[in-house]
């Protein structure tokens, strides 16, 4: 079959998502079953894989969906526990002392705290922690979800202590003789040095693209959720937003160059938190209290902004609790994530031991395997911390029981969307080996694009990485699928293939901004079920920016300078954004 036709067919399940979820605004619970059926139809009818393989991929998807629902439940339970104990009210007052300005708060929580959680745990965990915290502070649920999705970009490639590089890129490249020969020819004696070399390039690309992410967060927040529906209110804090961005990305790049791929996100975010919180307390670059920006009265909020989990001041207990005690559950979450993710501490191997791992190998006689390691899942940490909080905050049994009951009802509503979303993904990426002889759908699509773009491939490479993450819900899986393909394309068009692999990793991180099952999960955490398409519509421009800028920059780098198509496009993008911002600010009174 013609590669272009095959690529268009492979695009169909994604086109169904785009049409019904994003354009027609169907809820994910209705759109994703259609996408699943489309993927199954293609797998059986065009790729001609066996019914057993489709069934095995579906079962694996259901198992993964169950683990996601467990994580969502744990995150909701922790939020409801803090609501019932009164800690949320204390945390809210604490943030008011740092700054009552919602723009400052969202940058600290979503951009910095969220990046720290991403660096510690990865795999969408920031949405499970930062998004409900924002709702607890009084943000509309949809505003919190949009902010939580936007920051799942810069820190993602080094999330989970570098998993997308150390597992994703590593798995994709390490067994290929041509890649090994290339690394040795470039003087890398150790494979780990070669991975770190790619990691530095990834960090540089992220730092340049990520410099505007905090500004995107506040500008989109004021545009979609402010009383004035204006970008201006967000753009007014551009100095603080850029300062917060550099406070994280500068140490992020330094750490990538000196310590390797494990620590850029976690240490960059920690250093950034220390700098930005200290500066905010001292009033550096933050608006004066009388100029603080807030959402309008809740009575004026649109119904679509509000999730099933709504925290009202008059519902809160007023405990005698200090700020440290109120924050202690989140500190415990952060501590447990680090303790269980750093192998040298000795806990991670215990949690991943075969004795506490449930595996199903060769499902229905296929090569597909599924496994669950429940003690290692972030959901377990959330549940354990909730139980500790029950004792630590001296809660009553009745109020704690309410937290469990409300959490169970909320997570049930999200289950329909996820039990079709993840199986669709698994059928899509497990579609190789059929009688038709086609490669799996993601590779077929990527090869079709590569055949059309030719030497302009570096501009498109991040979009393939983003597509992989959009489908699979993981930068790591995207890198595993496409790193070798990207390396091969780079080598074929005569440019440094490590830059192309770096563009893949950056694009894979950007894909998390619009990834369907990440949006479903983040929305479910705050009870915002059925409005996933609206979230993606709001975050899609940020994804395009975050894929296009590194692509243009990468094209310029591999072609030796800025005086080429990539460099000119990069200048045009930033000039256009600057002109737009200046015009918006001129409208300001």
Q: Predicted segments — roles?
A:
Residues 103-115, 141-154, 167, 181-214, ...:
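Alpha-helical transmembrane segments of multi-pass membrane proteins
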Residues 164-199, 433-454, 481-488, 492-493:
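Membrane-interface interhelical connector segments
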Residues 1-10, 211-363, 530-540, 548, ...:
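Long, contiguous bundles of hydrophobic transmembrane helices that form the permeation core
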Residues 55-63, 67-140, 145-146, 395-489:
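Membrane-embedded alpha-helical segments and adjacent helix-loop junctions characteristic
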Residues 268, 298-464:
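Transmembrane helical segments that form the transport core of multi-pass membrane transport proteins
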Residues 2-7, 17-53, 74-85, 276-287, ...:
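Structural signal for alpha-helical transmembrane segments and their membrane-water exit/capping regions
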Residues 1-6, 25-31, 54-66, 197-205, ...:
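Interfacial loop-to-helix junctions that mark the boundaries of transmembrane helices
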Residues 125-133, 149, 162-174, 220, ...:
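Re-entrant/interfacial helical elements at transmembrane boundaries that shape
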